Amino acid sequence: MNFATADLCDAHEDQLTAGTLRVLDPVFSRFGRASRFGGEAVTLKVFEDNTLVRATLEEKGVARVLVVDGGGSLRCALVGGNLGKLGEKNGWAGIVVFGCVRDTLELNECNLGIIALATHPQRSQKRGGGERDVSLRLPGSVVRPGEWIYADSDGVLVSSAPLV
């Protein structure tokens, strides 16, 4: 997928004004080999438990983007090297984590895009909690299942419809 988020914003100013194209706040760090990624959003709401993250990444990604609302927790990582490799193997385009990741050397070898608030060496709990396909409130925008995510070095866009 070839795009630049800055160009998408310029080309779709009317959608920015209307609210059908939104920009996440610039609070995320980037990992993984993909300099840009985009696709249809699959949403998860979890808190310090990555059981549902693993279960979702075990599915075929079909170039979709997994968006994980981890409540912004900075106390443990929701995605590490094993899950990054799993996402790559199963064809996910990218992972957005409103929380932490770990194993950054391994994540940076994965051929997908990963963005997260920060890194943390401690793994999450495995309690089996969380919700899938729900609307998420992330910094700067709501993200609904089936919306479109576009991310590059300039930022992350959320669109109600595909832009490229």
Swiss-Prot record:
Enzyme Commission code(s) on record: 4.1.3.17, 4.1.1.112
Nucleus is among the record's keywords: no
Family the UniProt entry places it in: Belongs to the class II aldolase/RraA-like family.
Database matches in Gene3D superfamilies: Ribonuclease E inhibitor RraA/RraA-like
InterPro entries: RraA (IPR010203), RraA/RraA-like (IPR005493), RraA/RraA-like_sf (IPR036704)
GO molecular function: 4-hydroxy-4-methyl-2-oxoglutarate aldolase activity; metal ion binding; oxaloacetate decarboxylase activity; ribonuclease inhibitor activity
Pfam families for the chain: RraA-like
UniProt binding sites for a divalent metal cation: D103
The entry's keywords: Lyase, Metal-binding
Record's subunit section: Homotrimer.
Required cofactor names: a divalent metal cation
Cofactor: record remark: Divalent metal cation.
Protein name in the entry: Putative 4-hydroxy-4-methyl-2-oxoglutarate aldolase
Biological classification of the source: Bacteria, Pseudomonadati, Pseudomonadota, Betaproteobacteria, Burkholderiales
Any one biological process term the GO annotation gives: regulation of RNA metabolic process
Positions bound to substrate: G80, G81, N82, L83, R102
Function, in words: Catalyzes the aldol cleavage of 4-hydroxy-4-methyl-2-oxoglutarate (HMG) into 2 molecules of pyruvate. Also contains a secondary oxaloacetate (OAA) decarboxylase activity due to the common pyruvate enolate transition state formed following C-C bond cleavage in the retro-aldol and decarboxylation reactions.
Domain of life: Bacteria
Keyword Metal-binding: yes
Alphabetical list of SUPFAM superfamilies matching this protein: RraA-like (SSF89562)
Source organism of this protein record: Paraburkholderia phymatum (strain DSM 17167 / CIP 108236 / LMG 21445 / STM815)
